[in-house]
Structures are given as structure tokens and as C-alpha cells.
Amino acid sequence: MTQFEIECLDSKVYNARDHWSRFVIDPLKPGQGTTLGNALRRTLLSELEGLAITAVRIAGVSHEFSTINGIREDVLEILLNLKEIVFSGQLQESTIGRLTVQGPAIVTARSFELPPEIKLIDPEQYIATICGNNTLEMEFKIEVGSGYKIVEKDNSTEHFEFLQVDSVFMPVKKVNFRIEETRGENNILNEQLILDIWTNGSISAKEAISNAADNLINLFSPLKTIDGESETDYETNETSHINQILIEELQLSVRAYNCLKRGCAHIHSVADLLDYSQEDLIEIKNFGQKSAEEVIDALQKRLGINLPKEKTTKIYNK
């Protein structure tokens, strides 16, 4: 079977938050272009992770319909401007950013105080204008997610203090594709998939396709293990079978999967994971508590395996 190839035909950077690339994937058999195009488009738009502001606390403000003395924009306009801010970086759990500016001044994202692991894509993004000797002071939550998150009512004390923001996590803004017929060797009819991808600058289109492919591989990998073994045969070979299971079958998030398989740990199977305790997982470089809990939960629910809690004598590359 001829393996298809992907090539970047063209790319442009219109501004810091508007990148475009065009790819061609070929040769494909008739019908494969639509199958591949639909799967990639859906995954690129809805499943890739990104960072976004999800909540804001502004000094002296109790609700989103307030105005701030000496600030040209009302609170709702400021929230809409914050919603458009684009970040990049690796984040395991929510974090806090801050802004304090004394007027008169035009406030942009450049004035943000951010954790070192988070980067601004466009420091010139506009926030507000301060008139006179007034101060704009706020702090905001940054979270990792995918797709679009609509504000949900939350009466907890923490959420009461923060103004919630509809958040756009999607690093890919738009995807178009079309199918063209081509002729291969011996005049055989083939297809080629032309794929146009627009990103917000937090990742490149090439990275987006790679991440989408990882997601699709994780989705379909469990289908490879279907077999006709009887219940007796399965029970006899249960331990051996579990040890041979690849980590793809745990259906982990792309972040956790990449840290295990492509990071310094080089974990490829459940057998490899059994060498680790719960404390060992947390100490894997760039892994973190959230990813460790995801792996522990997947092993327990899918395979009935409970990792020991105590740390082993394993040596880690940090």
C-alpha cells in the first residue's frame, strides 16, 4: 500500500495572532480524502488544548455592568478585551496573572505580570485607557482547556469574587479543506487533500496537525486489541496480556501521553508504568499532580491496577 505524504505548500503570518498555512496530503484512495479531512478538521477545532483567561477580579468592581472611575471602557468592554488575549506555554493547572497600571495610560497586555511558564503572543493587545491620575488594578485566572467554555453560574465564595468570562481555548481558529482528483501510476485515480489552517499564533499549523494526529491515534488505538479469546483463555493469560497493553489504550490526554512516551521517562506500555509508584509519577519532568492523577485513575478504572503510593528508588532525569 502506498503511504501518503504531507507537504506545506504555503504559509503567511498576517499578524501575531493570525497565522495561515496550506498543506497537501496525497496520494489518497478515492473517499479517503473526505474521511481524513473531516476527522482532522473536527479534531483541530474542538480537541486541541490552549490557554485562556476564565475569570477576572477588578479592584472596586462587584459586577460586569459596573463602570470604573477614570477608565474610558466599562467593565464589560474590559472583559471582552481580556477574552481575546492569546497565551502559549505549558500549564498543568490554573494560575493567576496580575495587572496594575497608574494613569494616564493606554493599557495593553504588555503590562501583565505572568508566571514564567506563560508567554504572551501579542503584547500590544489593547485592554483599556486610563484617564487622569487613576489606577487600574486586577488579577485574572488562566486555565488550560479545549474548545469554548461558556460561563456557568457558581455561587461559591471564590467565584463570587471573580467575574466569569466566556473562554476560547482553541489555538486553531479556522480549518477548510477540499478534495482534488489526481492520476497516479498506470493512470490510477487518486485523491489529494488540500488543507487550510488558521491559528492564533500560540502554535504553528504544523504543530496543530501533529497534535491532532496524536489525538486521533489515541482515539482509534483501542480498536486494534479486539480478539476472539475465550473467557478461560483470557483469565489464564491475564497478567501477560495486561503487561503488553500500550499506554495509548489508557486514552490519556495528549499532554499526559506526550510526557510519558516522548519525555525523559520513555514509558510505552502498562508494564513500564508498573515500575512506578504514585509519587514517582509526580516527579516525572513536566508531568505534575493533575497528569499523575489521570494515569492513576485510568489504570484503576480500565485495568483494576492500583499503583503503590510510596516512592521507589528509581532515578529520574529532571
From Swiss-Prot:
Catalyzed reactions: RNA(n) + a ribonucleoside 5'-triphosphate = RNA(n+1) + diphosphate
E.C. numbers: 2.7.7.6
Keyword RNA-binding attached: no
Cellular-component GO terms for this entry: chloroplast; DNA-directed RNA polymerase complex; mitochondrion
Chain spans, region Alpha N-terminal domain (alpha-NTD): 1-227
Principal location: plastid
Compartments it resides in: Plastid, Chloroplast
Keyword flag Chloroplast: yes
UniProt region (Alpha C-terminal domain (alpha-CTD)), positions on chain: 241-318
GO molecular function: DNA binding; DNA-directed RNA polymerase activity; protein dimerization activity
Alphabetized UniProt keyword annotations: Chloroplast, DNA-directed RNA polymerase, Nucleotidyltransferase, Plastid, Transcription, Transferase
Pfam families in alphabetical order: RNA_pol_A_bac, RNA_pol_A_CTD, RNA_pol_L
Biological process, per Gene Ontology: DNA-templated transcription
Cited function: DNA-dependent RNA polymerase catalyzes the transcription of DNA into RNA using the four ribonucleoside triphosphates as substrates.
Domains as described in the record: The N-terminal domain is essential for RNAP assembly and basal transcription, whereas the C-terminal domain is involved in interaction with transcriptional regulators and with upstream promoter elements.
Family according to the record: Belongs to the RNA polymerase alpha chain family.
NCBIfam families named in the record: PRK05182.2-2, PRK05182.2-5, rpoA
Assembly, per entry: In plastids the minimal PEP RNA polymerase catalytic core is composed of four subunits: alpha, beta, beta', and beta''. When a (nuclear-encoded) sigma factor is associated with the core the holoenzyme is formed, which can initiate transcription.
Protein name: DNA-directed RNA polymerase subunit alpha
Naturally occurring in which organism (per UniProt): Guillardia theta (Cryptophyte)
